[in-house]
UniProtKB/Swiss-Prot annotation:
Its cofactor is Mg(2+). This is Uncharacterized PIN and TRAM-domain containing protein Lin0266. Its EC number is 3.1.-.-. It is an enzyme of class 3 (hydrolase). Pfam families: PIN. Mg(2+) binds at residues 229, 247. It comes from Listeria innocua serovar 6a (strain ATCC BAA-680 / CLIP 11262). GO terms for molecular function: metal ion binding; nuclease activity.
Amino acid sequence: MLTWVIRVCFLILGGTTGVFSLPALWVKLGIGHILLINNPYTDALIGALIFYLITFWAVKYVEAALNWLEEKLAKIAIATLIYGGLGLFVGLVIAFFASNALSQTNIPLLNSVVPVILTLVLGYLGFRIGISRRNEFGNFVNNRNAKKKTPEEEQTEEKSKKTYKILDTSVIIDGRIADILATGFLDGTVVIPLFVLAELQHIADSSDTLKRTRGRRGLDILNRIQKEDSIQVEMYEGDFEDTPEVDSKLVKLAKVMGGIVVTNDYNLNKVCEFQNVPVLNINDLANAVKPVVLPGEKMTVLMVKDGKEHNQGVAYLDDGTMIVVEDGRKFINETIQVEVTSVLQTSAGRMIFAKPS
């Protein structure tokens, strides 16, 4: 069906081209006075025939290009297409009025070449601005249409916005977020952006075995979260095409939605704090629920290896907390009692320093 549609379009294009182009050719060839040849019907027939013959070679390329375009458009959210189309329309309207003004001049370059360039450039810029700023336009329209709210309603709305929890790739692969959500410690709606899902799929398709395993684990965690009846899950289909990095997209999305980024990525945590974007690091939660260890407290540990500094030994608690023991190297593979001297607490984890008691 598509093949015949393409051929019909070529026939129409060929007939139109023949009507407007062939009369000048007949005059140059010296046969313009022959009415049987130089008439619109013959010109249209010859042009259509030539273009129809071209379709036997060109139709497969045109069909492949249309299929490629259809696949690309199918992956784009409808809101993106609408705002991109509106931006393109505005750009073309501006180019039309500018071209009309330039056509009044007697300078050949300004009234012929420049209007074409303006149409292409302004049309492209309008399309790109419409896509990249679609979220801001949407918020502007919503704010214009919104009725005047009371302070209580504004407070309730602000509170509901803060209930959006936007998951990043690292926290999904980690897996602990599924258990945290199931227990109800995090309220509100879980937002999973499509660009995060795409990154997970890319990791799951990796040739590296470790990456492939991590990606598939992340997809399994997402399926588990979606199947939980007590968890509200929303998919965000938009994208920020002017921003290639997923972390930067998450920060922008949190600003647009007024939500909170949930992560265990130390660098993303710092970026969110720098840009005043609310962020929850589940490593902070994990550290907060660990048993409190105070300086002077004694504990029994198994020395497993030597430390980085001279004569240091390293042991671990059951929850994985590292204990650095001064002068503990000589006790490797032995169970000894140590006394806590200090505790270092960060978002990356907790480290305990001790000495043999």
